[in-house]
Amino acid sequence: MLTLSQFEIIRPTYESSQEETLNWLIQAHTQSEAYSQGKKAEQIKPFTLSLRQKLDHVACKPNRISKRGHILSDFLHTEWEKMKVYRLEESSFGVDLTTRSKIFSDQVEDAFEQFYPKSAASPDHLIHVTCTGYVSPSGGQKMVSQRGWGEKTLVSHVYHMGCSASIPALRLAQGSLQVEGCVDVVHTELCSLHTNPSLHGLNQLVSQSLFADGFIKYRAQASCSSEHFQLYTLHEELVSNSFDSMHWKIENWGFALSLSQEIPALIAQSIYPYLVRMSQKSGFTIEYILQNALFAIHPGGPKIVQSIQAVLGLSFAQVAHSKFILQQFGNMSSATLPHVWKEILEDPKVVTGSLIVSLAFGPGLTICGSIMEKRLPCG
């Protein structure tokens, strides 16, 4: 069976409180609109007031997300001419995708160097997961080549699958795992590269109030010598006729995210029958799971966790780790669920033998999940 262990986080260079980030967004959107109108920011105060009211209505509040990490210093000031990405005195959205991709590539290469110091042993298989930038050869491939690991280490990519990509990554790891081998999964999500201050719609304001940068690595193997998760089952479904609810498209300026307000309702109406089908594959009854399992839910936003908690009748304790990660880090796309896993694995209050149900959601609309058990060292 597949086990997961050795979770390691690298925090982004910078961090801002949610209140600071929301204030920055107001100023950025105002500057973008002023550029489009050929005016100065102070000349469009009615726009600024209207935008502030919209954000007050739809943005994720500081009591839900306390802070967010970002690799760009841009979010720490409003001197637009000194920005790396958001040069809003030159255009309404900042630099183009080519420039953002170069920043992504540099940051990912640096992350791999941090995850794998010179003394690190090579994994048998390295899976790179991201939906926020694609450069070939990837940072993982470059590192493997530079270290001379190319004859032993296979490199695979799980790209553009959105917030649910950790589950397909586990499926890939499970399929390639050898009895004696190990598979490393590395998530590098740089969501802060893809804010567009020229898009003032409500769904854009919602997403811009949620997403953050995140980096995490973990190991999959047949057995391990530390506390770990043992995987029982993986399950993935597409919700019928829901493909318009979530889009992640590549534009000339960056990656454009579109989220429908119907997503929480779509998930709420689909999650119980989905969970029944996944439980049947695992050997556990749905009744046992609902009463005893902890739920590692990808916190795409507070409403996602709340709606699932309500529909399934879960206690606060069963979803507490998901809410905590959202509050501490924001939505880091595919890196978020592994952060929840790490929090559960290292929580001494979660005893050995605890069942963990994971749920994540991506474009499609896709529901991905797993059932695991927290266990003591083995093998």
Predicted regions and their residues:
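Solvent-exposed alpha-helices and their adjacent loops that cap or buttress functional pockets
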Residues: G148-E151, S176-V179, N203, Q208-A212, ...
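Active-site glycine-rich loop that binds ribose-phosphate moieties when present
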Residues: K152-T153, V158, S166-L172, L190-G214
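Condensing-enzyme catalytic core mediating Claisen C-C bond formation in acyl metabolism
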Residues: M1-T99, N196-Q269, P273-R277, F361, ...
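Short beta-strand segments
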Residues: Q6, V129, Y159, D184-E189, ...
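Claisen-condensing/thiolase-fold acyl-transfer catalytic domains that form or cleave C-C bonds
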Residues: C131-T132, G150-K152, H157-Q178, A268, ...
